[in-house]
Amino acid sequence: MKIEKMNFYSPKKYKWKGIKITEQAIEQILFLINKNPKNKGIRIGTKKSGCAGFRYTMELVKNNTIEKENKNDIVFYYNNILVYISLKEAPFLNGIKIDFVKDSINEVFKYCNPRIKTFCGCGESFSID
């Protein structure tokens, strides 16, 4: 990977608070990345969904897509995890906490954002102030 291609987010522009990833989520993300040597990191984003507007997304970034990444991405390391965030989605992700929760047979990443204004009835989508 070429470090000179990394883009750095301007904290003053959006009063960037960063993201927080819990130890449980870090362990699960590293487990998923290490399942395939082509996996190099994660992309965190949002997608239009549901009746309230958006839902959070997380996908693995493969080695062959690193060179194709948009120059409008924020790229940084978080506890040895290479993280990509689109600059246009950064305001939606500002200040989020990502956790990994095991509840009986269900295992899921949970996203906590103090700026969420409303949830849809099923809790899948949200809107932000």
Swiss-Prot record:
A Pfam family reported for this protein in Swiss-Prot or TrEMBL: Fe-S_biosyn
Cross-referenced Gene3D superfamilies: HesB-like domain
GO biological process terms on file: iron-sulfur cluster assembly
Cellular component annotations (GO), alphabetically ordered: cytosol
Transmembrane segments: none
Cross-referenced InterPro entries: Fe-S_cluster_asmbl/transfer, FeS_biogenesis, FeS_cluster_insertion, FeS_cluster_insertion_CS, HesB-like_dom_sf
Gene Ontology molecular function, alphabetical: 2 iron, 2 sulfur cluster binding
SUPFAM superfamilies the record matches: HesB-like domain
Family indicated by similarity: Belongs to the HesB/IscA family.
Name of protein: Uncharacterized protein BUsg_114
Organism annotation: Buchnera aphidicola subsp. Schizaphis graminum (strain Sg)
